[in-house]
């Protein structure tokens, strides 16, 4: 709790002339115990002493006598802060307490939650104004009441204001009625409600009710937001005080009910308000915005952060300022037009086109003042003007006039939120489910000091806060030039994006925070984290507690690639499970700065694995960054290795112009390959660069040279037919274009880069993909041929069914063993090279028996396949399956002793398109045919002699008689079907003899 000293006296003297703010909205919102009692003072003093002894002096245990000076120092600081706190109004106190709460750890937050609950219970039980507090709470969330209040504000014209200020009581009865602080609005009670004579009273009531808005009440929130455009216009017409609108902005920007899209839309109107305040402070309220501002403002546009630089993102925004000026010259017409300007005119970009934002504010603009307004100033992540003033003041620069009195309390709330105008503001670096916004809150310290001073000025003016608005007191300027030491403690830039309901409601439990893996033992501490709808948001903060009890810690220190930002191309092309994949996500580090060319410093440091030193560059300009030396880095506490690496990388930044010039010349002359040029672009795209339009010599314009090289590379890829179109090179080039689109230097050329990226993506899609998994030659049954394999003589199917390795002859009848005459039956056949198989118990028409099916080989399509699955074949006749017994078949083999001995392993030859595996055709086409049944095959003789037929019949009869003798007990009923089947088959074959064709 020991704070830095050295400028305490400056702050004390700066605010010595300030008094308590007396223009608060209503006294019922003030706590009843605002003045500490004696008991409270004693308890605070005891707690202060205890805290000082515990944490005030790190070396307190070494020397007990040193605790007294530390105790006195802390007590003085607490007294100073308390005195300042009492001088602030309710809105300032709320913003300060909100900022302090976000710096506490979880146990401290729970303690404060219990204390707040207890205090609320006691105050509601003992306070005399508890009824009014409850009524205000109800009205703040009642859409009907708020709508009536808004309608009354819109219908109250400036002419009505003048009439109301001079009207009698009878005239007031005819005025429209709207809500009060003490009762709920109903149509029957309109006459009993308090009558507001001015719009200021309505804004005071809104200011009282806005903090009581409950998250989730979308209807009430929409009414509050609808009031903002009308109130800003009235402020510019000097109808209502500026300080009231600023305080309303402050509540809205930190309210948990306001989403990120609503806050982004509020930023548009906030910038218009900043423009008006800056112009009023410079004495330009009644002048056209197209006129040249004073020389002080022109000088401050680039060095001290003038209002025109803060609010002019594009020429259309500048033109809108002209419209604002013209409306301020015609108050009546401007107020009448504000009736139709509701919240839909500032809808988020996702709901409405950007060129239609702000309604009639952009209707009269046709040009821009390029001499006084830098269109690039507002493109650097949309930082408010007050943050620019703070960064320049921290560098010791002076501010002209009262240009620091820009935002009031709004600067404190807006800088805490890190408001951005672009659509990519919510994009943050995500790693392991944790969003990280890497920037330091100290950049907004001066902004909060300005807001405190502005609000104190409002308090001193009392009932007339508009007067002396353009001329601040001299002591206040000195106070702004010397920010207090506790400014960084009270009003840190916490930078969260408060998006959803109950973000930091103390009535609900703090959401569980996600932790992330760390590869380093040295980590930075962070501020307390707020829960989000998607993930936790972590904000780097050097001023927070150094306790190890923080639930999440930022910034590991992983391994370093090299001394430059050269990356492996494979890491840019391929995907995997490495946690470095999302490090190249654009805008993952929200480094908010107004220094031109430095917004991308966080991305560059992250690529170097040196992002923990991002705080060194928060207030540096681009030129100062290039002048950093290794000795300077070591003098500010950077380690030796990191300082050496960073110094080498900064030296390489100075060589970028020469490298790009060399690459351009070699590409034009054809001496460099495209892949080498793309590699050089990869090393430069993440480095900080000034915008192309920045003043300076052309040889130092890195962005312009970078775009020239990209143009040469892309034209070569698209037009040169001899260029090597590599898929990998195209992918890396598209990655470079994606990074360039989000780079500050090419922000005005983003559309051209997107078109170029689209063309390259189409080219990449049209490229022939690489053939993967190519089978080498000579491998596999097809010898590496990826086409359909064809049948040939070398790969003819073998009869593996019956265990034979001999190939089946598919072109002729291969049954040589069965081609014999019955004349030679009594004698062995000497020319047989193949012999019949042993008898099988079961067999079918295809000769495969009951064995497993064979997968058909690739065969010529001109022949049908008979080798399919057995399920697809017709069932065999029952005579061939059920009436052959093993004993009978053995006797038949013994009787036909003219057959040679058959080995067990020799299978019969089969033809895939004939029936020769079942029968052997005997005799010519004119001879009758008959079947001779054998165990496993039938034979048709091929002899023209009638003796063969007679001999065959005698042989059949002898065979049947022998079977009867051997069977013995077999009945004639069992044998009769076999004779009948044989006779039927012979008769049928004899009749259809002429239809058989021998092959």
From Swiss-Prot:
Pfam family membership, one: SAM_1
Biased composition (Low complexity): 44-69, 329-338
Keywords, in A-Z order: Cytoplasm, Developmental protein, Phosphoprotein, Repressor, RNA-binding, Translation regulation
Effect after changing residue 724 to I: No effect on RNA-binding
Effect of residue 642 to H/Q: Loss of RNA-binding
Region (Disordered) residue spans: 1-69, 329-349, 773-892, 955-977
Consequence of changing residue 634 to L: No effect on RNA-binding
Effect of residue 665 to R: No effect on RNA-binding
Mutagenesis / variant outcome for changing residue 632 to L: No effect on RNA-binding
Residue numbers of Phosphoserine PTMs: 564, 575, 972
Subcellular location: Cytoplasm
GO molecular function terms attached to this record: mRNA 3'-UTR binding; mRNA binding; mRNA regulatory element binding translation repressor activity; myosin binding; translation repressor activity
Cellular component terms per the entry's GO annotation: cytoplasm; P granule; P-body
Keyword Transferase annotated: no
Domain (SAM): residue spans on this chain: 600-654
UniProt xrefs under InterPro entries: ARM-type_fold, PHAT_dom, PHAT_dom_sf, SAM, SAM/pointed_sf, SMAUG/VTS1_RNA-bind, Smaug_SAM
Stated role: Translation regulator that binds to the 3'-UTR of specific mRNAs such as nanos (nos) and prevents their translation. Prevents translation of unlocalized nanos in the bulk cytoplasm via the recruitment of cup.
Protein's UniProt name: Protein Smaug
Species: Drosophila melanogaster
Gene for this chain: smg
